[in-house]
Amino acid sequence: MAESSKVFKKSSGDGKLAIYLAKRDYVDHVDHVEPVDGMIIIDPEYQKDKKVFVTLACTFRYGRDDHELIGLSFKKELCFLHCQVYPPLPEDKKPLTPLQEKLSKKLGVNAFPFCFNMTTDLPCSVTLQPGPEDTGKKCGVDFEVKGFWADNVEEKISRKNSVQLIIRKVQFAPEATGTASCVQTTRQFMMSDKPLQVEVSLDKEVYYHGEPVGIKLKINNNTSKIVKKIKITVEQLTDVVLYSLDKYTKIVCCEEINETVAANANFSGSYSLTPLLANNKEKRGLALDGKLKHGDTNLASSTILRPGMDKEVLGMLVSYKVRVSLVVARGGILGDLTSSDVSVELPFTLMHPKPSPDQTNIEDVVIEEFARQKLQGAEGEDDKDDA
């Protein structure tokens, strides 16, 4: 039996246009990004006296819709690519990709190709989780492919006469990883001849979503004080670098260890924490991977930067760290009044594993059409988000 590949289809409200894409996720390999190639079917009626365009836009939204009603716009277009697919322009003619060749044979003479090449300095798809009472479009970065007919590409477009699909730009974990993180710190206290030594290490550098983070802790308490509390947290850091220098730190998982370390004593232990969105569903401002409405999402993946890359064009940068905090105090009833905090931080990378390469020798395509439907709890979302 011949092998087949799924192709995604979305039609305009009036049924006159339909866009076909081979995928919804396009991989940023750091040094290049996969091209966005597809086909658009144009009703013969539209081919008489109309121009048809396809665009790819990357937009960073950093404010709510209701602010736009009073004349304030809290969104910035980071990239806008466009091409006129009908009538086709001779200077834009390019060889068909393997996908386009197969779709051209399947769809017939009313199908026209388009292809966009994104630059490597665009951010990946990411969104900030709204609070329970928030409505409207979510803050974050999204990518939209749109097809429409107009006299020119800047004309105001009717949603009925256009078709939009949300796609995602994603990164996957690198195949080659560095050594596991290990950090040591020493704290000298008054009235103690010797210091407190803390060593924290992770079992590896890169973790996949849903995978536990393994942490080893060693404490050499050579002081006259007592380690009264030990707390381990996994924190997500989001730098909003496009319009401000805002930095958001969110604890995504935490464990308090019921252990004390007496004066002149040692302690060691191994712990495991798993950062999951399921445990942080109502945490406002948490960064998530860009969401396609028909699928679930997860905590945002770590941002991987190309050496020398300008961070400010990326909109939002996401990173993770493990923090181990100790509360050190003197013994006795009044000891807590003079307590000190000792903290150790270790960065790590949280990403999806790289999937198996796409098959290029497929013999047929299977078309999956997207229904226009609203999901529960998505009131106020634009229709394009259902794509």
Curated annotation (Swiss-Prot):
Keyword annotations for this protein, in alphabetical order, are: Sensory transduction, Vision
**InterPro entries assigned:** Arrestin, Arrestin-like_C, Arrestin-like_N, Arrestin_C-like, Arrestin_CS, Arrestin_N, Ig_E-set
Q: How would you summarize where this protein is expressed among tissues?
A: Retina and pineal gland.
The reply on keyword Ribonucleoprotein is no
Has UniProt tagged this entry with the keyword Cytoplasm?
no
Q: Which GO terms describe its molecular function?
A: G protein-coupled receptor binding
Family that this chain belongs to: Belongs to the arrestin family.
Give the protein's biological function: May play a role in an as yet undefined retina-specific signal transduction. Could bind to photoactivated-phosphorylated red/green opsins.
Q: What is this protein called?
A: Arrestin-C
The organism encoding this protein is: Xenopus laevis (African clawed frog)
